[in-house]
Amino acid sequence: MNQTNFEWTPAFWQGWRESNNPYRRYKSNRDRQLVLELLDLHDGERVLEVGCGYGWISQALWDAAQINWFGVDQSAEMIRHLRQIPLRADAPASMADAIRLPFRDGTFDKVLCTGVLMHIAQSEAATLELVRVLRPGGRLVCSINNAMSPYALPVRVWNNRKRGFVQNFSFPRSFRKLLVGMGIKLGALRGDGIAATVPLNIGRFQFPPSSLFSSVQALDEWAANRWPCLAYEVWFSGIKIVRPCVS
């Protein structure tokens, strides 16, 4: 299979997030919905968004409450694009590696990392950093790509053509065990979707078909809420109850 170089750019993600494809739009809005439900934001809270990108999720956070938001991303281009959002030229966002966050222990009330851990080779080290900078009693919200998803294998095969692209799929039970071992008391799992949030477009072939969006979306949301362990992206939310032990 021929490989092509892949780069994370604001244009790529904005094109995906704000696509005319109804399934991509649904996925993007579903992510915002889950973030706000799980984070339960309140005025005055210090909130860290790891992997803030060009600001799609960030804008939903800013609108939800008067929070003290901080964002980090490994891409300077993403940060520049985020600061082009009206009234956000001075947004406290900076370049940082998720496995070496530039914050003291227990700095934040809430820590969010969605759509990121699956693209980090050292995802366990990054997860430990998320917990480290969260205060005891604070809330962590993060997500993984699900190895139990029906789409896990075809997506892996498709992404093999992208040189330099990292995408890990994890089992929810294993990741849950990891978080518990780091001192996170978890709530129920949530899922983005099973089929409606992973649209396939290869040439003229599209699945699921756009003409069936309304029916597919309604059925898929019901199924993902009932069986989140089959969702393509699984979301975890929990409270930090102890400081993790680092050997």
Q: Locations of the language-model features?
A:
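A C-terminal cap/extension of S-adenosyl-L-methionine-dependent methyltransferases
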Residues: V155, A188-S247
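Short catalytic micro-motifs in class I SAM-dependent methyltransferases
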Residues: G115-H119
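Class I SAM-dependent methyltransferase SAM/SAH-binding core
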Residues: Y54-R100
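Conserved class I S-adenosyl-L-methionine
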Residues: M1-D40, W56-A60, M78, V141-V166
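Short alpha-helix
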Residues: Q167-G183
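A short glycine-rich, Lys/Arg-flanked "PGG" loop and its adjoining helix->strand segment in the class I
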Residues: E124-P136
